[in-house]
Amino acid sequence: MSKVSNGGGDSKNTLYCSFCGKSQHEVRKLIAGPTVFICDECVELCMDIIREENKSSMVKSREGVPTPQEIMAVLDDYVIGQKDAKRVLSVAVHNHYKRLAHQSKNSDIELAKSNILLVGPTGCGKTYLAQTLARIIDVPFIMADATTLTEAGYVGEDVENIILKLLQAADYNVERAQRGIVYIDEVDKISRKSDNPSITRDVSGEGVQQALLKIMEGTVASVPPQGGRKHPQQEFLQVDTTNILFICGGAFAGLDRIISARGEKTSIGFGATVKSVDERRIGEVFKELEPEDLLKFGLIPEFVGRLPVIATLEDLDVDALVQILTEPKNALVKQYQRLFDMENVELVFHDDALRAIANKAVERKTGARGLRSIMEKILLDTMFELPTLEGVREVVISGDVVDGSARPLYIYAERQDEKGNVSAGMA
């Protein structure tokens, strides 16, 4: 029968966790089995691993298709806010699975795919949503950067490289690759330089849009086997892109002004109340997005037509950024606490510190993407000193530390009884 130890006892009989090596005095519970021991922290870690595997396998419906609610539930664990965008993605991925599941069945109605465009300011979670989808879906998934693409025949990657990467993600299984999902990031960077047709060749803008049209709509792409270079005598793998779902994302800097200008034209009169762009958050403006605004931005009509589903993301306020710091399963605060835990030190953030970090990210207009760099700067000196310091039990980060007017507070194990309460009060 296994026994549970709550700590205590003399040092000669000290027991240690067989997995992490911590002693019974460093953990809350130590469970004993035949010749092995496991602490409560390792039990929790094992439970997290099991939960992760359950989530990634995902509960399937009777048709073998994950429901939108199931997909969104997993996205909610990792991505804070952006409810509308998550609903759009969940439905689109569900429909993608459903189309593939029913494709072999005889029907007079052919189900067309609906590619997606994600529009949102920098650091609002577009790329992270796609990365999270990659972990939870059961089809090959790749991310491509639109800024590296050029027309075929010019220096740079041509669009068929996207299909090659998808094929590699499917271990060169053509059938699996043809059921995959492609996320194209920074798609706003391939807009043409003006909304008038150009008389000069635009190989990285309009030219790339033209090249993407065929693979997004559905064509048979010739891909060199095992990623080799193309040459005339070579055998090619034929990949049909008809059933590949394309998700495009971009920040579209300046699009908010185009939308607002259109709104001002339609809101003229004594009773009209028009807020300037500065008075409204970018996410609010993006909610009024129409396809004609994308045309003015520089996307060609055919390209916009290939993206019938448009999901807009909101810019993140201070409260949302604080949630991002603490609530997701792999939240930044949890990541740094784990790093400090490896030194047997507890890292504590006061609420005012979290809000100060979020405020800095808002001021810099970097969104969630800027949180890590702010955290790194705050904790750099501490992470440099900590491995050589002895007896540090706890590091406390307050709002003053984030503002630069104070240093992190170190609480030493041997001073806990004498000065522990005083130190905590100072923080």
Curated annotation (Swiss-Prot):
BP-aspect Gene Ontology terms: cell division; proteolysis involved in protein catabolic process
Amino acids binding Zn(2+): C17, C20, C39, C42
Domain of life: Bacteria
GO cellular component: HslUV protease complex
Amino-acid positions noted as binding ATP in the UniProt annotation, renumbered to this chain: P121, T122, G123, C124, G125, K126, T127, Y128
GO molecular function terms listed in the Swiss-Prot or TrEMBL record: ATP binding; ATP hydrolysis activity; ATP-dependent protein folding chaperone; protein dimerization activity; unfolded protein binding; zinc ion binding
Record-linked CDD domains: RecA-like_ClpX
UniProt domain ClpX-type ZB: residue ranges: 5-58
SMART domains listed in its UniProt record: AAA (SM00382), ClpB_D2-small (SM01086), zf-C4_ClpX (SM00994)
InterPro entries hit by this protein: AAA+_ATPase (IPR003593), ATP-dep_Clp_protease_ClpX (IPR050052), ATPase_AAA_core (IPR003959), Clp_ATPase_C (IPR019489), Clp_protease_ATP-bd_su_ClpX (IPR004487), ClpX_bact (IPR046425), P-loop_NTPase (IPR027417), Znf_CppX_C4 (IPR010603)
Keywords: ATP-binding, Chaperone, Metal-binding, Nucleotide-binding, Zinc
Assembly: Component of the ClpX-ClpP complex. Forms a hexameric ring that, in the presence of ATP, binds to fourteen ClpP subunits assembled into a disk-like structure with a central cavity, resembling the structure of eukaryotic proteasomes.
Annotated function: ATP-dependent specificity component of the Clp protease. It directs the protease to specific substrates. Can perform chaperone functions in the absence of ClpP.
Similarity-based family: Belongs to the ClpX chaperone family.
UniProt cross-references to HAMAP family, sorted A to Z: ClpX (MF_00175)
Protein name, as recorded: ATP-dependent Clp protease ATP-binding subunit ClpX
